[in-house]
Amino acid sequence: MAGQNTMEGEAVALLMEAVVTPRAQPNNTTITAIQPSRSAEKCYYSDSENETADEFLRRIGKYQHKIYHRKKFCYITLIIVFVFAMTGAAFALGYITSQFVG
């Protein structure tokens, strides 16, 4: 659980340190409003020279998704092991008591 909080903290810290580097535009032009048809500017991070915000978030999302499935697999495995252990214990207890009764 602590590792997940650390990773989320790092992801938030990297997002907070994002540096927006717009495409080169002439100095004499001013942008009054972003047109809806115009594609959004790409956002790059100071840590990486070629990783955009979308790529970064996709990478972090895949990592979080992988951890979620790994935990889910571990929980299901533990439940199955517990059920088999209890079933084995019940059969063993039945066998032992049958030795004394019968």
Curated annotation (Swiss-Prot):
Entry's Gene Ontology BP terms: intracellular transport of virus
Region of interest: Acidic: 41-55
Q: Name one GO cellular component term.
A: host cell smooth endoplasmic reticulum membrane
| Membrane topology per record | Single-pass type II membrane protein
Intravirion domain ranges by topology: 1-75
Keyword Transmembrane helix tagged = yes
Could you list which ranges are Virion surface topological domains?
97-102
- Does the UniProt entry include the keyword Calcium? no
Q: How is it modified after translation?
A: Phosphorylated on serines within the acidic cluster, possibly by host CK2. Phosphorylation determines whether endocytosed viral US9 traffics to the trans-Golgi network or recycles to the cell membrane.
InterPro entries, alphabetized: Herpes_US9
Entry's localization field: Virion membrane; Host Golgi apparatus membrane; Host smooth endoplasmic reticulum membrane; Host cell membrane
UniProt motif Di-leucine internalization motif: location? 14-15
Report any Pfam family annotated for this entry: Herpes_US9
Residues with PTM Phosphoserine: 46, 48
Give the function comment from the record: Essential for the anterograde spread of the infection throughout the host nervous system. Together with the gE/gI heterodimer, US9 is involved in the sorting and transport of viral structural components toward axon tips.
Name recorded for this polypeptide: Envelope protein US9
- What species was this sequence derived from? Varicella-zoster virus (strain Oka vaccine)
Instruction: Give the classification, highest ranks.
Output: Viruses, Duplodnaviria, Heunggongvirae, Peploviricota, Herviviricetes
